[in-house]
């Protein structure tokens, strides 16, 4: 059980830091006015996972469980002069399982960003510091620095290219400590402004761990569709996406006597429903298929969730 609960933290942290998320979409929104703005969002909910799994430490329970979830985000944006933007925030998430309480995961993340629009291109840097605690124990600290370039092309295309340097420190598991270098490119194709758009992206990663068996290289491709529409006198938002990662390990994995090879496919869908001006609900579903020549890392999962939230 000890090995299982450690892995779940890593999965949560990588989900927080990886990929184009709504926070990044807002961070890159053009046309910010001078001054300071604040944003807060809180959510509570419940989710069911058909297979409580720990993909990044290669184990799964084969059993499902319910969990209560809590999320909170506080963010401040400061635009001292036109074209210069500073942003800082704190993000917290917590899961509380019904049966597998040893898998209760808390993630704390602080982040800061600075960007300047040079007209030809926007230059920025984003920093993340995250800590994961599982069942009350500190497990993983992750730091990341991500310089980036972005450019808006008219009203139909937005591109963002970035390099990420990441360092992982595992409490009590120094053989898994690692540094990673990644390059990524994301494109936002606006079909009807922000009412309907597509996000296409890719990332290549090289990770070097203390123990050679955990070194790997990977490439990832993703696509996401967002549609806002009116129904029941409300403006609803539908999101759907798919992500595929091919990961090849550089050295022999002792358990199988050969280098590992993983293929991971994740598809998800979500609908956001306003409940007045400040309140909202989210209904989501995610399917994950994890293929590997290491038997304990070969499985699939279904995750459904319902959340209620407030934002200011």
Predicted regions and their residues:
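Gram-negative and organellar
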Residues: 23-312
């Amino acid at each position: 059980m000890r090995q299982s609960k450690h892995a779940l933290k890593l999965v949560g942290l990588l989900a927080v830091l990886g990929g184009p998320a709504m926070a990044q979409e807002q961070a890159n929104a053009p046309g910010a006015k001078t001054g300071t703005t604040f944003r807060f969002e809180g959510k509570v909910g419940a989710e069911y996972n058909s297979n409580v799994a720990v993909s990044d430490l290669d184990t799964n329970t084969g059993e499902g469980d319910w969990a209560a979830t809590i999320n909170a985000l506080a963010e401040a944006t400061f635009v001292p002069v036109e074209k210069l933007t500073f942003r800082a925030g704190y993000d917290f998430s917590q899961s509380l399982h019904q049966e597998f309480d040893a898998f209760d995961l808390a993630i704390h993340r602080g982040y800061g960003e600075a960007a300047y629009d040079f007209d030809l291109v926007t230059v920025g840097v984003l920093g993340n510091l995250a800590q994961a605690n599982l069942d009350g124990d500190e497990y993983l600290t992750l730091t990341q620095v991500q310089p980036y370039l972005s450019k808006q092309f008219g009203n139909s295309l937005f591109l963002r290219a970035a390099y990420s340097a990441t360092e992982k420190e595992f409490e009590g598991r120094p053989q898994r400590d690692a540094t990673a270098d990644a390059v990524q490119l994301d494109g936002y194709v606006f079909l009807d402004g922000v009412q309907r758009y597509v996000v296409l992206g890719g990332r290549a990663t090289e990770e070097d761990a203390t123990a050679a068996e955990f070194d790997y290289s990977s490439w990832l491709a993703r696509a996401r569709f967002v549609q806002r529409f009116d129904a029941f006198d409300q403006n609803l938002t539908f999101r759907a996406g798919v992500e595929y990662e091919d990961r090849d390990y550089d050295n022999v994995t002792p358990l199988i006597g050969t280098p590992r090879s993983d293929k991971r496919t994740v598809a998800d869908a979500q609908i956001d429903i306003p409940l007045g001006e400040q309140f909202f609900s989210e209904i989501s579903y995610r399917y994950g298929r994890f293929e590997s020549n290491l038997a304990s890392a070969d499985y699939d999962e279904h995750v459904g969730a319902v959340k209620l939230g407030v934002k200011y």
